């Protein structure tokens, strides 16, 4: 008896709303832990479910959303213990499934009535069962479908429709004689399950809702794929979409056209994502991809499988959306539920109903931060920070740096120029030189924003078109300085001559400094100056060679040398005189009177 009660309770009689009502008070007071960076937690889903459910019931009172409370485990157990439970009268067969498509199909008679029988009562006689349909025939048809070989001559959807439309087993025999094709190996069939990037939009054609899908890499002559919507959307109600269109929208752009969607169900269909977000406007669904490791599977066809897949597979937990118009992003945000400073939208999958997924738009007002209007911005006190989490706002980064190193006058988040979406880097200008030097010496900072907490590195921000700080362009014919020394003892721009003089002659402790070079949008730290062509470069050996060459040039050249050479020789001669007053280095210990 206990087993039967448990089995009856396992049928889909309780929805997420009923589960939310049964949760304990401690669980309802528990806040999200924040361990997951992008995926919503179970506690968040339970808390959000009551908010979604109440608003849905107030809007349309859909009976499909509310379930029969009498089908709970406690009620079934009490009735079975009293031995007076009538399955045919008490159980609402339509309430066992919250899939609107299935209920519509049962009502129209498109599926066998055997599917609507109560669970665990195979001997129950229901008048609506077709007498010509028995379990053996149904099992035979299912086995025939599963064992059917693939053939490119006939689409699989048409074949399945023909099989389900037939009531006799003789109609299945032509499909069981299909020959297996040799065009693709069997192991490559799962490649079709990989999610693909598509530009989608929900439109109305001939009074029918359809999804227009097209490959973003296709040519202009490629015809789009039209998918009819034979059912209402499982995620966003139509009245909710209409309500968002009635809300006032800003004429100025408020968000980036690129939106992050996190916490997707692992088995969500890409068509469900298309239908949900394509209703707000034309959008590119960009599934992130990562390398696929075969782990020894594939056999002899490993090369074909990996080449057909291009060593990539889609990541199911999140997706990026790139809308054509920024207005669509505003409508999407208006349709979301705002909960604990985050936006959520419901989305369903075959195994999860009304899953709360996070919608994370990027506000354009979070790109820059200014301490005040009167604060000056000096690029010589600017640092570069890479690896910044994309949800981090400029004000959050400024607050983290001020707690560690000092006052910040400006913070700018590096964004994509077209989409205005963060690239994961930032530039920070300090209010004074002391804070700038402390930040360069500290090298790291802990950035905290919402659920993210990351340690990032601080580097000097190298600018282009800067003259040498030592000679002001005199020794390099007024060319721009190619090197920048990021050590806290230097922090200057140098030409080639001044780099050698300041690092190998004037100060011995700077010989191990490494130059920083700006190439395009990137800054590289080189192991040695590029004008030193020796593959076995050593700072100490170059220091001695440079000193000998400068000393010999002073003896060989007279007053007929150029002004640049005289300046270099004068500086090197002065440094030699200063070095002669010091005690030379000796490997053996010095004695008194040496």
Swiss-Prot record:
A GO MF label: mRNA regulatory element binding translation repressor activity
UniProt keyword Chloroplast, yes or no: no
CDD domains in UniProt: Bbox1, RRM1_CPEB2_like, RRM2_CPEB2_like
Residues in the signal sequence: none
Alphabetically ordered keywords of this record: Developmental protein, Differentiation, Repeat, RNA-binding, Spermatogenesis
UniProt region (Disordered), positions on chain: 1-33, 519-560
Domain (RRM) ranges: 257-364, 381-452
GO BP terms: cell differentiation; negative regulation of cytoplasmic translation; spermatogenesis
Origin superkingdom: Eukaryota
InterPro entries: CEBP_ZZ (IPR032296), CEBP_ZZ_sf (IPR038446), CPEB (IPR034819), Nucleotide-bd_a/b_plait_sf (IPR012677), RBD_domain_sf (IPR035979), RRM_dom (IPR000504)
Bias type Polar residues, positions: 11-22, 535-560
GO cellular-component term (any): nucleus
Subunit structure: Interacts with fbf-1.
Name of the protein in question: Cytoplasmic polyadenylation element-binding protein 1
Organism in which the protein naturally occurs: Caenorhabditis remanei (Caenorhabditis vulgaris)
């Amino acid at each position: 008896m206990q087993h039967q009660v448990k089995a009856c309770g396992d049928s889909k009689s309780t929805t997420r709303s009923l589960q939310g009502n049964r949760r304990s008070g401690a669980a309802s007071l528990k806040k999200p832990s924040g361990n997951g960076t992008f995926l919503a937690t179970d506690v968040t889903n339970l808390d959000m479910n009551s908010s979604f459910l109440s608003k849905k019931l107030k809007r349309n009172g859909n009976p499909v959303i509310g379930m029969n409370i009498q089908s709970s485990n406690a009620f079934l157990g009490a009735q079975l213990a009293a031995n007076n439970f009538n399955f045919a009268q008490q159980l609402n067969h339509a309430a066992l499934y919250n899939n609107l498509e299935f209920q519509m199909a049962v009502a129209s008679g498109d599926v066998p009535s055997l599917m609507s029988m109560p669970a665990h009562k195979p001997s129950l006689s229901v008048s609506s069962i077709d007498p010509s349909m028995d379990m053996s025939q149904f099992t035979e048809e299912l086995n025939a479908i599963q064992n059917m070989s693939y053939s490119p001559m006939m689409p699989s959807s048409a074949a399945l429709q023909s099989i389900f439309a037939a009531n006799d087993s003789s109609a299945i025999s032509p499909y069981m004689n299909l020959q297996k094709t040799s065009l693709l190996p069997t192991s490559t069939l799962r490649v079709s399950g990989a999610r693909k990037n598509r530009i989608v939009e929900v439109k109305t054609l001939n009074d029918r809702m359809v999804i227009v899908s097209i490959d973003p890499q296709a040519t202009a002559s490629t015809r789009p794929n039209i998918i009819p919507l034979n059912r209402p959307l499982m995620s966003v109600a139509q009245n909710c979409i209409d309500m968002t269109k009635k809300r006032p929208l800003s004429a100025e752009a408020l968000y980036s056209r690129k939106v992050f969607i996190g916490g997707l169900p692992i088995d969500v269909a890409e068509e469900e994502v298309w239908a949900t977000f394509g209703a707000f406007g034309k959008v590119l669904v960009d599934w992130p991809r990562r390398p696929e490791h075969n782990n020894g599977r594939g056999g002899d066809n490993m090369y074909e499988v990996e080449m057909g897949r291009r060593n990539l597979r889609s990541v199911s937990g999140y997706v990026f959306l790139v809308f054509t118009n920024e207005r669509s992003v505003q409508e999407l945000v208006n349709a979301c539920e705002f909960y604990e400073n985050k936006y959520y939208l419901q989305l369903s999958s075959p195994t999860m109903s009304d899953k709360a997924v996070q919608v994370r738009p990027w506000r354009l007002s979070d790109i820059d931060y200014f301490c005040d209007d009167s604060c000056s911005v000096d690029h010589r006190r600017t640092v570069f920070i890479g690896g910044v989490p994309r949800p981090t706002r400029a004000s959050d980064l400024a607050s983290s740096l001020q707690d560690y190193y000092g006052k910040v006058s400006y913070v700018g988040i590096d964004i994509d120029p077209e989409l205005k979406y963060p690239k994961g880097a930032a530039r920070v200008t300090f209010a004074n030189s002391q804070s700038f030097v402390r930040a360069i010496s500290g090298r790291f900072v802990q950035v905290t924003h919402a659920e993210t907490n990351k340690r990032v590195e601080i580097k000097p921000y190298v600018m282009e078109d800067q003259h040498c700080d030592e000679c002001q362009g005199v020794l390099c014919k007024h060319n721009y300085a190619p090197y920048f020394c990021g050590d806290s003892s230097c922090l200057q721009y140098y030409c080639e001559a001044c780099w050698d003089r300041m690092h190998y002659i004037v100060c011995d402790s700077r010989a191990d400094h490494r130059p920083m070079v700006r190439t395009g949008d990137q800054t590289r730290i080189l192991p040695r100056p590029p004008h030193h062509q020796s593959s076995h470069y050593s700072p100490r050996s170059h220091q001695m060679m440079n000193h000998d060459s400068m000393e010999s040039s002073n003896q060989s050249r007279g007053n007929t040398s150029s002004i640049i050479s005289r300046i270099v020789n004068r500086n090197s001669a002065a440094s030699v005189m200063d070095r002669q007053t010091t005690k030379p280095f000796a490997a053996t210990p010095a004695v008194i009177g040496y």
